[in-house]
Curated annotation (Swiss-Prot):
Biological process terms in GO annotation: translation
Originating organism: Corynebacterium diphtheriae (strain ATCC 700971 / NCTC 13129 / Biotype gravis)
InterPro entries (alphabetical): Ribosomal_uL4, Ribosomal_uL4-like, Ribosomal_uL4_dom_sf
Protein name from the UniProt record: Large ribosomal subunit protein uL4
SUPFAM superfamilies for this protein: Ribosomal protein L4
Record function comment: One of the primary rRNA binding proteins, this protein initially binds near the 5'-end of the 23S rRNA. It is important during the early stages of 50S assembly. It makes multiple contacts with different domains of the 23S rRNA in the assembled 50S subunit and ribosome.
A Pfam family of this chain: Ribosomal_L4
Length: 217
């Protein structure tokens, strides 16, 4: 495993040095089964699970027998709220439940590193010094800069929490999703075609992730 070097791009389209992507984070073996499991767990945890259908016992009405048991020529019925009646209860319907799955932290980290490795190997990770020049937010400038970096549809922009200029500049851009370094996750990396880090956010992420990588060893 070798560290990958990337150019740091400026808002003016120039190069401002290089950064190293540590091999223990950006050059890992990616397990498709692990990625699938972690993404499924992540999406499941987003579900509210508040769905609820009423059974025949919970539907209002239906307390009396609709007609006598014998002599009518019809099939016997005990309640108009049985599941086969219009307006009746639901049989085997959904009830409130917790969809979250327990996923070990090591698996979550390994999946994230695997997803970032895939993006790095396909040259879909980019590093910028700043999204727009100066301290004035500009959606037009941000859009132009991102389009120069990549022509793909979905872009994940990882910036520092203090970088308000970048956040305001990119928050209304279609296809651009903004995250902070401590929010980076497997699903958003895989959903995005390209990942664009600011230098500040990349350093923050590497410092956090390097500790996790050392713990795995």
């Amino acid at each position: 495993m070798t560290n990958l070097k990337l150019d740091v791009l400026t808002a003016e389209g120039k190069t401002d040095g290089q950064v190293e992507l540590p091999a223990e984070i950006f050059d890992r073996e990616a397990s498709v089964a692990l990625l699938h499991q972690v993404v499924n767990a992540q999406l499941a945890a987003k579900r509210q699970g508040t769905h609820s259908a009423k059974t025949r016992a919970e539907v209002s009405g239906g307390g009396r027998k609709p007609f006598r048991q014998k002599g009518t020529g019809r099939a016997r019925q005990g309640s108009i709220r049985a599941p086969h009646f219009t307006g009746g209860g639901i049989s085997h319907g959904p009830k409130p439940r917790d969809y979250s799955q327990r996923t070990p932290k090591k698996m979550i980290k390994a999946a994230l590193f695997g997803a970032l490795t895939d993006r790095a190997r396909h040259e879909r990770i980019h590093v910028i010094s700043e999204l727009v020049a100066g301290q004035t937010p500009s959606t037009k400038s941000a859009r132009s800069f991102i389009e120069r970096i990549t022509d793909r549809r979905n872009v994940l922009l990882v910036v520092g929490r203090e970088d308000v200029t970048a956040q305001k500049s990119a928050r209304n851009l279609p296809g651009v999703h903004i995250l902070f370094a401590d929010q980076l996750n497997t699903y958003d990396v895989l959903y995005s075609d390209d990942v664009v880090f600011s230098v500040e956010a990349l350093n923050t992420f590497i410092n956090r992730a390097s500790g996790a990588a050392q713990e795995e060893k």
